[in-house]
């Protein structure tokens, strides 16, 4: 008689959704987090001062530059970067704990952070790049935010640099219609979750049948 399949034992994964500013990444990731209890947002460590309403361990882990540098030197950060004079990074411990418990972690990083995560956690990172339908459409979205022309020009230049790395991601989603883009990202996440290599229970289950992977 066939042994029943266990319902637990899957290793978690790291989901990176990268995109140029204005492509809709925040809208997509907010929707995923709201509907999926198995997906949690990675909490970064930063050297910037807390803003009003921000809580330690909820929005960020706030550290001095000296503390941050020590964490990086000791290998406690999966990835890190310096942005506008402040340091940001991903603490290793909480992510590894989540993965071992079968939870999936969503990261708000750029293409450089994606590569650092892949190096630190080979086999655990799924990368999706979100594109706008066109650069003209992206410019229109940025204009709709009410940004000043010089800010829009800066963001468009940064977008071109970011888009140049789209080929380094295994998945790409074009955000023409937001609900469809959300559904595509959801489908990719589901497929990644069901990969054979993530099913920690499988070897034991097959062993009970006298089989092996």
Curated annotation (Swiss-Prot):
The enzyme's E.C. designation: 2.7.4.8
CDD domains: GMPK
Name of the top EC class for this enzyme: transferase
Subcellular location: Cytoplasm
GO cellular component, one term: cytosol
Keyword entries, A-Z: ATP-binding, Cytoplasm, Kinase, Nucleotide-binding, Transferase
Entry binding sites for ATP: 19-26
Reactions catalysed, as given in the entry: GMP + ATP = GDP + ADP
Pfam families from the UniProt entry: Guanylate_kin
HAMAP family xrefs: Guanylate_kinase (MF_00328)
NCBIfam families linked to this entry: guanyl_kin
Similarity-based family: Belongs to the guanylate kinase family.
UniProt function note: Essential for recycling GMP and indirectly, cGMP.
Protein name: Guanylate kinase
């Amino acid at each position: 008689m066939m042994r029943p399949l266990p319902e637990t034992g899957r290793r978690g994964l790291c989901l990176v959704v990268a995109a140029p500013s204005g492509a809709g990444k925040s809208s997509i990731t907010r929707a995923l987090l709201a509907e999926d209890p198995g997906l949690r947002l990675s909490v970064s460590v930063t050297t910037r001062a807390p803003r009003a309403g921000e809580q330690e361990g909820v929005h960020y882990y706030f550290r001095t530059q000296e503390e941050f540098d020590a964490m990086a030197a000791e290998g406690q950060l999966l990835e890190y970067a310096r942005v506008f004079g402040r340091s940001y990074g991903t603490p290793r411990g909480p992510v590894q704990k989540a993965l071992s418990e079968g939870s999936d972690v969503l990261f708000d990083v750029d293409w450089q952070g994606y590569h650092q995560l892949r190096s630190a956690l080979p086999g655990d990172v799924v990368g999706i790049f979100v594109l706008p339908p066109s650069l003209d459409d992206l410019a229109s979205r940025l204009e709709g935010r009410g940004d000043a022309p010089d800010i829009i020009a800066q963001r468009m230049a940064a977008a071109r640099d970011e888009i140049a790395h789209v080929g380094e991601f295994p998945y790409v989603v074009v955000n023409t219609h937001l609900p469809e883009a959300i559904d595509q990202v959801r489908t990719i996440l589901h497929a990644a979750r069901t990969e054979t290599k993530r099913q920690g229970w499988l070897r034991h289950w097959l062993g009970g049948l006298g089989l092996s992977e």
